[in-house]
Structure formats: structure tokens, C-alpha cells
Amino acid sequence: MTYDYKQDFPIFQHTDVAYIDNAATAQRPQCVLDAVADFYRCHNANPLRGLYPLSVEATDIYEQARETVHDFIGARSAREIVFTRNTTESLNLVAYSYGLTHVKAGDEVLVSIMEHHSDLLPWQMVCRQTGAELKFIECAPDGSVDLRQIESLITERTKIVAMTQVSNVLGRKYPVQEVAAMAHKKGAVMVVDGAQSTPHMPVNVQELGADFFAFSGHKIYGPMGIGGLYGREELLEEMPPFLSGGEMIESVTRTGAVYAELPHKFEAGTVNAAGAAGLAAAIRYVQSVGFDTIRQREHDLTANALARVLAVPHVHVLGTDKPEDHNGIITFTVDGVHPHDISEIMASDGVNIRAGHHCAQPLLAHLGLNATARASFAFYNTDEDVDRFVESLSTLRERMGYGK
């Protein structure tokens, strides 16, 4: 009998919805809730600042969480792991602290058209302030990319290549390892948005060739408000801080400061130790389930849903008809029905999906669309969730007055 992973997630004991919006945020297992509550209940003090036992305990929990993240993504050292609020903050940190100090007029920054706004707007800012040129990797209508075209775009003028590992709209996995190798040949650094990859597959930043790798805790069953940035130690060492204030310094005078050692010079102010504890618990939970199990379950759910959605008249799915190209994400349109109406009608059926531009307006414009609906599955979803989703979708146009 297949284990019902929903029983690990308390929210499903309190609501009977088919939650299929996991690309926006995942639900949290009991062990994550326990880790956050335990920190506040038993260990709450300001980490890194006190010498009394509670503060030392809080510091230990925080730094142990950093070690957990370092092991999870294959960094060389915990010094290469900076805690942030989320992927957005991580990418902005790289843009401000690395981009603005290493990019100049005449240089090029290369991003893909598939990027979430969080991996586009920071690079627009860098190019605007430095006079560099922003260039784009395009994708085909099915979301695929041409490695030869990418290689031709990376030149001696290219200083930064930024690319998502998995698209939050298409669900497609991109060849960031190959692109990183091309970037490094030309002396550019590789920035990887891992927000949508870390929940679904093992990540090893060294094998990927990532110079920077950003991810969010809440996408991988951890708390909101905690995320991570991996950066190669030699790059982080030379970068100025992103924020200034308490705890990111060794000493301060009237006229200047000596910054703290890595990674603390990038973690100004009181840190989110409870969030870090919850993130570590989420990682341990994912490891206990195992990525083999996660990938198989998500593939089976996606295959079931995709085949049935493709058979519904007037429904159009973005990307390919192969479930392995979707990583749990099925983005679609329905003839004559606005995505917001799709989402509202499905919500009335107890099916929770996302509607809108998914913070990827340039990609949707490239595909000739303004908005879409998106269902995104996690390993804890069930065939019953798929049934409810497809049944709601199948009757949607009729309920809107279009007939069958």
C-alpha cells in the first residue's frame, strides 16, 4: 500500500482542498512546525551575540542549519552558504554586491527569457546603472533551448550568465551545467535560480558549475522568510556587503568598519534562526522521503494529469506532452475563459491552482500570452487530487455558458 504523505502535513487534517499550487509555496510537514516551535519554546535568544547558554544554543542551531544546507546542495564549505529571506533576496544580493562591482559599460549580462522576475529585474538594474547590455537566451514554443545559440551569445564581453534550472511556468529543466561550462570558457560567472529545482531533484552546485545558486525554504517544505545563497568562497570574499548594520562587522570606528568573516558579512541584523531551524528540518524530511521517491511520485501524478488534461477540448497546455518535461508543473489556457475565472471556479470546487503571469511576463509575452492557469504537483498530492482537478477543468466551459 502506498504511504499517504499527506498525513505528515497538518494542514490537510484541517482542510479538504486539493492543493495544487506547490510551485508558489509548498505545505509544511509536522517536523518543520515542531522545529520552529521548539526554537521559540526552548532556545529563543539572539544568536551570535550572547555568551549565556540560551544564546549559545541558538547560535548552534543556526550554524548547524547552515551545515545542513551546505551538505544538501554540495557546497565545498558552510562559509559559502548565506542565509537570506528567499530566492529574490539572494539574487538581489548577487546583483548589487557582485554585479555592480564587476560589470561596466560595454559589458554584457545574459539572461534567459524563461526567468522569474526575481532573476530579471536585478540584472536590468545592473545594466541600467552600469551601461552594460542585457541580452536574452530565447526558447522555442515548447520551452526548449538551443545550446549552439546560447554558446554564440556568450562572448568575451559577457560577465554574467543568469539562468533558471527549472522554469516556474513550463516546469522544464534547463542545461545549466552545460551553459556554466560555456560561461566559464569566456570568463563569465554563472548565476543559477534554483527555486523550482531544489524541491524536485538533487542539487550539487559544484557539479552544476554554479558560481552562485539561490533558493527558497518555503518551496522545499520549509518556513517562509528563510532562503539561501551559495556563492563560491573566492567570489564572496571580494564582494562588499549587501546590507550594513549589526553583527556583520568585526570592528567599527567613526570613519569606517572592518567586516566580519564569511558568511556573516552578508547577514546584517538579527537573523532568522527559527526559520533556519525549520529549513534544516525540511531538508532532513525531504532526505528521509528520498528524491527517488519524490521524482517517481511527481512523475506519475504529472503523467496522469497531463494525459487527461490534453484530452479535454479547448484546453491548451504550455510545453511538451511529455511528463518528464514538466517537473510537476502543468500550465494551461482554456479557450474563452480568463485564467482568473478558471482559478475562481476551481477554488469553488476545492481545487487550489495559480492564475496570472506567474512573475514571468516576458516569457508569456514571448509565447503570445498575457496570463495562464497553473497546476503544480508535489509528492504528497494524490490521484484523488488529480481526479478533482480534471473533473473541475472538464466542466468549466459548460459552467461558463459555452456549452460542452
Language model features by range: what are they?
Residues 1-404:
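Pyridoxal 5′-phosphate
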